[in-house]
């Protein structure tokens, strides 16, 4: 169970760090939820890279 210490009554910062920690745990769980063959894992990785690249190019072209 993730633990976060609240310092100086700053609940917002503690809540933010708690959400970040739990989201990382959730991502790791979903990643290892079932077995992916190496070829499919590679395709997913390439698909994610293309999505990231398209997002970057879209933001970059907005300013021109």
Swiss-Prot record:
Highest taxon listed in the record's lineage: Bacteria
Family annotation (InterPro entries): Ribosomal_bS21
Single biological process term from Gene Ontology: translation
Keywords: Ribonucleoprotein, Ribosomal protein
Amino acid composition bias (Basic residues), ranges on this chain: 50-64
Pfam families: Ribosomal_S21 (PF01165)
GO cellular component: ribonucleoprotein complex; ribosome
Annotated region (Disordered), positions in chain: 42-64
Gene name in the database record: rpsU
Family matches, as NCBIfam families: S21p (TIGR00030)
GO molecular function: structural constituent of ribosome
Protein name: Small ribosomal subunit protein bS21
Family according to the record: Belongs to the bacterial ribosomal protein bS21 family.
């Amino acid at each position: 169970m993730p633990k976060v210490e609240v310092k100086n009554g700053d609940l917002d910062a503690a809540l933010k760090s708690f959400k970040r920690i739990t989201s990382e745990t959730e991502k790791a769980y979903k990643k290892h939820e079932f077995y992916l063959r190496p070829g499919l894992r590679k395709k997913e990785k390439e698909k994610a890279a293309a999505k990231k690249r398209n997002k970057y190019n879209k933001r970059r072209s907005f300013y021109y």
